[in-house]
């Protein structure tokens, strides 16, 4: 992928295709790169190259994901497409490819299918902010009424999972026709309409630097004559000298004031999202803070023990468990920088969980962690990853 020709002046948005197997997600991805490449807005990536996506490791889990990029007049898009259903589930739960918006692909010939429903539910659970719909294979349906029926079904399904089904743009077309006739204005109209819908409907994400300050603590040092320094990578926002901050998690929340910020031994006025910094804290002893806590803007995040989550349990082949587990299972939950033991309670009617399953369950931790909806974690047994999850709701 030639990086030079992309101007980074345009705002950047992350998207991905979701939908049932064989409804045309990968064909659409290829068609978009082909059609847009003719206008210099993308490099054409062929279907075969997207379909045999390389496997990547994210939190110890192997996920096959294809990444393509393209532009519209207004934006630069990074777009992910996964070859298999299991890859989608893992991708969305681990947040390996964070999505600011999703392109739901539904075959007009089949209408919504089980994985259509599952992907919409997952998008809702993991907090994908918005969805646009591409109704594919419309060339295979002669009956206008049938197309309308499928559209209504899709809108109903989106409403069921609390997406605004009545307002979501649904673009009709054929990805295959567009891919095979990339210069045909009529057959590629749907691709340009989709891009327009993405520009107009998917909101631009808030930049990490504009969010309230948060830094997971990785290490704690005592510097004689100066006090206690905690180090870590700023996850979001900025931190300045004289800022009042809170230390959240594991024990009672404490307030303190930043008396110094340094990076690579140099003194800074402020640290911002992405920086690895040392933060000097007023009146805090080395024993008052520990790895696993976070520094945060006061009131922006609170500690919790009980939450609901969506989790994927690794297969034996992925290095996970060899046997099922039941309600009352007590693994460690690795949040940001530390493990905390917790108890899993399975949903009613669920007897047990097999390796390879994805589940919704309740967790009760033995210590509180600074937590919010959308926080990712790994499930571990003695340092070995056996699952991955995302907080979908805080209970207390």
Curated annotation (Swiss-Prot):
Mg(2+) binds at residue 26. Residues 174-176 are annotated as: G5. GTP hydrolase that promotes the GTP-dependent binding of aminoacyl-tRNA to the A-site of ribosomes during protein biosynthesis. Its main location: cytoplasm. It holds the Pfam family GTP_EFTU. One of its GO terms (molecular function) is translation elongation factor activity. This is Elongation factor Tu. Gene3D superfamilies: P-loop containing nucleotide triphosphate hydrolases, Translation factors. Residues 81-84 are annotated as: G3. Residues 19-26 are annotated as: G1. Keywords: Cytoplasm, Elongation factor, GTP-binding, Hydrolase, Magnesium, Metal-binding, Nucleotide-binding, Protein biosynthesis. NCBIfam families: EF-Tu, PRK00049.1, PRK12735.1, PRK12736.1, small_GTP. GO terms for cellular component: cytosol. Its EC number is 3.6.5.3. Monomer. Residues 60-64 are annotated as: G2. SUPFAM superfamilies: EF-Tu/eEF-1alpha/eIF2-gamma C-terminal domain, P-loop containing nucleoside triphosphate hydrolases, Translation proteins. Belongs to the TRAFAC class translation factor GTPase superfamily. Classic translation factor GTPase family. EF-Tu/EF-1A subfamily. Residues 136-139 are annotated as: G4. It comes from Flexistipes sinusarabici.
């Amino acid at each position: 992928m030639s990086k030079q020709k992309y101007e980074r002046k345009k705002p950047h948005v992350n998207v991905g295709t979701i939908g049932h197997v064989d409804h045309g997600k990968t064909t659409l991805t290829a068609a978009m790169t082909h059609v847009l490449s003719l206008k210099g807005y993308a490099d054409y990536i062929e279907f075969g190259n997207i379909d045999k996506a390389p496997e990547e490791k994210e939190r110890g889990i192997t996920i096959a994901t294809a990444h393509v990029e393209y532009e519209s007049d207004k934006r630069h898009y990074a777009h992910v497409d996964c070859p298999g259903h299991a890859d989608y589930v893992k991708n969305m739960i681990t947040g390996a490819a964070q999505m600011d918006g999703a392109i739901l692909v539904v075959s007009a010939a089949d209408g919504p299918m089980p994985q259509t429903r599952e992907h919409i539910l997952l998008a809702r659970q993991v907090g994908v902010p918005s969805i646009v719909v591409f109704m594919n294979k419309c060339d295979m349906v002669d009956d206008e009424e049938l197309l309308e029926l499928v559209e209504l079904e899709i809108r109903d399904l989106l409403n069921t999972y609390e997406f605004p089904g009545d307002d979501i743009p649904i673009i009709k077309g054929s990805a295959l026709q567009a891919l095979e006739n990339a210069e045909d204005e009529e057959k590629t109209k749907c691709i340009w309409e989709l891009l327009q819908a993405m520009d107009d409907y998917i909101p631009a994400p808030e930049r990490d630097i504009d969010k309230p300050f948060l830094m997971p603590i990785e290490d704690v040092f005592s510097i004689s004559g100066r006090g206690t320094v905690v180090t870590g990578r700023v996850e979001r926002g900025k931190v300045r000298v004289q800022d009042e901050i809170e230390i959240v998690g594991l024990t009672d929340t404490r307030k303190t004031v930043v008396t110094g910020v340094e990076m690579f031994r140099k003194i800074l006025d402020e640290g911002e999202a992405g920086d690895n910094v040392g933060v000097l804290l007023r009146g805090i002893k080395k024993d008052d803070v520990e790895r696993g806590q976070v520094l945060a803007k006061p009131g922006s995040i609170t500690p919790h023990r009980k939450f609901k989550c969506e989790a994927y349990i690794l297969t034996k082949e992925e290095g996970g468990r060899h046997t099922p587990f039941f309600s009352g299972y007590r693994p460690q939950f690795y949040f940001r920088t530390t493990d905390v033991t917790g108890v899993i309670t399975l949903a009613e009617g669920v007897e047990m969980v097999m390796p390879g399953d994805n589940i919704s369950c309740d967790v009760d931790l033995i210590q509180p962690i600074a937590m919010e909806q959308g926080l990712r974690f790994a499930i571990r047994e003695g340092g070995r990853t056996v699952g991955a999850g995302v907080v979908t709701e805080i209970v207390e």
